[in-house]
Amino acid sequence: MSKGEKMKIKVGVLGATGSVGQRFVQLLADHPMFELTALAASERSAGKKYKDACYWFQDRDIPENIKDMVVIPTDPKHEEFEDVDIVFSALPSDLAKKFEPEFAKEGKLIFSNASAYRMEEDVPLVIPEVNADHLELIEIQREKRGWDGAIITNPNCSTICAVITLKPIMDKFGLEAVFIATMQAVSGAGYNGVPSMAILDNLIPFIKNEEEKMQTESLKLLGTLKDGKVELANFKISASCNRVAVIDGHTESIFVKTKEGAEPEEIKEVMDKFDPLKDLNLPTYAKPIVIREEIDRPQPRLDRNEGNGMSIVVGRIRKDPIFDVKYTALEHNTIRGAAGASVLNAEYFVKKYI
């Protein structure tokens, strides 16, 4: 290590062999702040080299410095976790409910992509560009639950896409009502989540619990932290969620009625200026909202990798006869909407609190 170089924080990944787990591996393999030293998965995978334990289906090969790492059980007392300070969780919700508290009790900071604890009143549900102050709930969580670690969550993928675009609108004009129709990529369900015969030549107008997550999480994210609790935002929100035959990239049609009234050009201006973390030099951070002027953008294949997959791409901002405005938003669902969201939360936390 060269003189003046900061020592990296050792991190681990739970659920490392799955779709989101693989994205975590990609993002952390050569990270300037974090050193990936522990990969945990099921008992079936434990003991195998990572390259043998997972069916890798990302757009780039398994990182050279990771592929021969040995997968370990999801056990916070395992020796590989001894020096790990931060753990990223890509576990399914039921397993997250069981294992994440065990890691918190061992003093680990859990940055979780799982839904298990998102709506607990003492658990921060965070998009750092939107509500970084909610991280103050960590101290309340520690006191209430009696552990030295903490669970910090990021929202559902489709929620992130919508809320990042709604935040600058709410701050300037207020929100009265929001309607969202989603067209969500199959990668959001995992590699085996949607059978090919079900999605090819088809659209599935139902994703279990997705609409409820969007509606409840949005109000918490855009709520106000007061006296140690989050007061939910006060506007009406409705979502209708669909699975479509796209590999990566959630697209959303968003309709917004504001309290003050707003024109499309005004919405475009506040979105374009929205860049609250630009001075922090966070490695994973990108400009949150990128505006496209073309009449047929954004599109998943063309726009999902904007900002290395961390930017929300917005287009077709126009007047609406029922609401005030409507627009189309696109995110890379497994990067900005999942692993990238957790990593950005961790980067922000380290920058501000460590």
UniProtKB/Swiss-Prot annotation:
Q: How does activity depend on temperature?
A: Optimum temperature is 70 degrees Celsius.
The protein's GO terms of the molecular function aspect are: aspartate-semialdehyde dehydrogenase activity; NAD binding; NADP binding; protein dimerization activity
List the CDD domains hit by this protein, alphabetically. Answer: ASADH_C_arch_fung_like (cd18130), ScASADH_like_N (cd02315)
Keywords assigned: Amino-acid biosynthesis, Diaminopimelate biosynthesis, Lysine biosynthesis, Methionine biosynthesis, NAD, NADP, Oxidoreductase, Threonine biosynthesis
Q: Which residues bind substrate?
A: Q184, E210, R243
Which parts of the sequence bind phosphate? R118, K213
Q: What's its top-level EC category?
A: oxidoreductase
Query: Which residues are the active-site ones?
Result: C157 (acyl-thioester intermediate), H250 (proton acceptor)
**Known EC number(s)?**
1.2.1.11
**Binding residues for NADP(+), per the UniProt record?**
T17, G18, S19, V20, S42, E43, R44, S45, S187, G188, N333, T334
Q: Which PANTHER family match?
A: ASPARTATE-SEMIALDEHYDE DEHYDROGENASE
Q: How does it assemble?
A: Homodimer.
The protein here is known as: Aspartate-semialdehyde dehydrogenase
The taxonomic lineage of its organism, from the top, reads:
Archaea, Methanobacteriati, Methanobacteriota, Methanomada group, Methanococci
- Coding gene? asd
